[in-house]
């Protein structure tokens, strides 16, 4: 009996560091063994763009010589356009990254990398965001290998509905990783103060202060896993409803007067 070949995946890759980022190129090359890889990414660095979607201006795209597609927009724009009109075929999964720098704790609220994955899930596809820890960014190949493994696992055991995975990988050789940990989001202390300066024309300008240091970073958190050289895998829900607050809110809503 002739065996039927297992259909290859069609993967959509995006990021927030821009279409020319090293992490994106390494990820695309590594995942090519799994199937067809389409890359649709911002034309420049869009870190911190969160879930912003361009609604009041047209978006220009450019087909690059390497086959990637550059979008004059945010990470969310890229994934939205790719899935709803730019790509000739629907992808099977969205992968965002590899981000240059971790997305831990409160970072996920601002991260364009996480937002790109979230947009994929909004549009009905399994999705994950992957970030490389540290500051030197030497081992993108490690993060790419981790993603390769996770995609193979997700194929066999799909993610729960309305869930994406936020993956953070230590900047280490693969053989030095201590394992995989399923984690919750930690928290940071309040951000550093805004920095006020004067421009050459005498006008005040402001720089957003640095992210605050780790606060809730104990066992079970994404911070803890990364600090102990483990890959952090945090499931994030698209549904932001705080169901545990329903009873409390219902009790005082009854006392409101119209």
From Swiss-Prot:
GO terms assigned for molecular function: 3'-nucleotidase activity; 5'-nucleotidase activity; exopolyphosphatase activity; metal ion binding; nucleotide binding
Requisite cofactors: a divalent metal cation
Keywords: Cytoplasm, Hydrolase, Metal-binding, Nucleotide-binding
Record-linked InterPro entries: SurE (IPR030048), SurE-like_Pase/nucleotidase (IPR002828), SurE-like_sf (IPR036523)
One Gene Ontology cellular component: cytoplasm
Gene3D superfamilies listed in its UniProt record: Survival protein SurE-like phosphatase/nucleotidase
Cofactor note: Binds 1 divalent metal cation per subunit.
Pfam family of the protein (one): SurE
Protein name: 5'-nucleotidase SurE
Gene: surE
């Amino acid at each position: 009996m002739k065996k039927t070949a297992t259909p290859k995946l069609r993967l959509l890759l995006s990021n927030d560091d821009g279409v020319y980022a090293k992490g994106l190129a390494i990820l695309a090359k590594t995942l090519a063994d799994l199937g067809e890889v389409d890359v649709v990414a911002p034309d420049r660095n869009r870190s911190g763009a969160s879930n912003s979607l361009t609604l009041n201006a047209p978006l220009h795209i450019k087909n690059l010589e390497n086959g990637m597609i550059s979008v004059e927009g945010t990470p969310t724009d890229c994934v939205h356009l790719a899935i709803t009109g730019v790509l000739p075929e629907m992808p099977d999964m969205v992968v965002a990254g590899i981000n240059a720098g971790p997305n831990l704790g409160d970072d996920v609220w601002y991260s364009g990398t996480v937002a790109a994955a979230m947009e994929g899930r909004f549009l009905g596809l399994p999705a994950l965001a992957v970030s490389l820890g540290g500051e030197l960014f030497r081992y993108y190949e490690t993060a790419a290998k981790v993603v390769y493994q996770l995609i193979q696992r997700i194929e066999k055991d799909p993610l729960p509905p309305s869930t994406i995975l936020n993956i953070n990988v230590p900047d280490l050789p693969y053989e030095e990783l201590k394992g995989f940990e399923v984690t919750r989001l930690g928290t940071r202390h309040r951000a550093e103060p805004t920095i006020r300066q004067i421009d050459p024309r005498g006008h005040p300008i402001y720089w957003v202060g640095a992210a605050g240091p780790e606060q809730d970073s104990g066992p079970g958190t994404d911070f803890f896993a990364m600090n102990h050289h483990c890959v952090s895998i945090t499931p994030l829900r698209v549904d932001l409803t705080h169901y545990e607050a329903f009873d409390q809110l219902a009790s005082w809503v009854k006392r409101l007067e119209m």
